[in-house]
Amino acid sequence: LEGKENLFSGDNYFIIKGEVLALRAYLHFDLLRIFGASCTVGMERIAIPYVTEYAPTIFPQEKVGDFVGKVLKDLQDAAKCLENDPILTGRTVSEIDDNGYLMNRQVHLNYYAVKGLMARVYLYKGDYANAEVCAKEVIGSGCFEWVKQENLTNESVADLAFSTEHLFALNIVTLGNIVDKYLDGGNNSFALEESRLSEYYGSSYDYRYLYLFKTGVGMSNTLRYLKKYDQLESVSWAQSYRNKLPLICLPEMYYILAECRYR
């Protein structure tokens, strides 16, 4: 993006750059967790490359500590770029503004999603002080709310993905077709016995237990199938509930905060 600033209008250059930096950090961090040693095993262990250019170049493998440092550097730079993010400034955005590009910030790596990801990375690193600071900033923003029970009780228009809790989510227009292969109650589906489901949630008052599972039919009536990603057919079903696959959510910030306080 460097040298192409004149191609963008308004705040778009810095906001898009911030999102791109954050996405690079997100993807690299997940790759590290899969293919690299954890920070608790050894910060000096050789892990994987951190790719910073779109080029036919072989990048050197990084030590775990150096790799995590580069993840955090990208996230810090991203947060700086996103200082004018509407989710942070409170600026109202409509379709009139650049065709609404900066609307629906929860399906972009917005400022608070970056802070949430920083909390995740700092916790992984063992830097509990900074993890707590970042988690508290997200929680204290007031931009994300716990799902309300009244938005779950009507099965035809329920907020099954708990969308108000999303810091960052993907909008996958084919999500229904994907999950129906595995969660539709057929022979090849993933399912839980009712007894096991009760063990997991322990209380019939847990919203996940009450509203996110459906009962199998016929010979499968003892099984419970996840319906969190079901795509409902009602025309009244809110657009903000559709096709959402959450990647960073509000509850994680509370878990991080709790672990930091414990440490």
Task: Give names to the regions the model predicted.
Residues 258:
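Active-site-proximal region of nucleotide-activated glycan assembly enzymes
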Residues 1-22, 29-251:
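Structured, solvent-exposed acidic/aromatic patches
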Residues 240, 261-263:
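C-terminal soluble interaction/assembly domains
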